[in-house]
Amino acid sequence: MSTTDWNTLLPALPALPAQTRIALHAPTAQALLRARGNFKNLTAAQPEAEVWIIANAQAVQAVVDAPEAMEAALPRVLLCPNTLKNNGLSAPANVQVLPMGAVEALARMQADGWIYIRS
């Protein structure tokens, strides 16, 4: 069994730029749980990075059902208005809703230089 030499595999990776902006896409309840962990880890490692969780599809229902489960990430969660409308849901008072569908928002964010991560 061989060991991986991470210095060879990932040679001298530069630090993330100070203006790093990351969009964590969560389309399922399981992805939402991963996004919460990703958010926690990213903001601990890169406190100056701007990190948002974009929830659509089944992840929206998970946020609506238990917003408190998002813990510290809750102020950085954005819900898809299309999913809310199509499922007859309302966003909790303390949760933000995107001004457009999640897919369009993610496309625009990527075009504007955001890093996309599917959680």
Where are the regions a protein language model picked out?
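Secreted/extracellular ectodomain signature
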Residues: 1-119
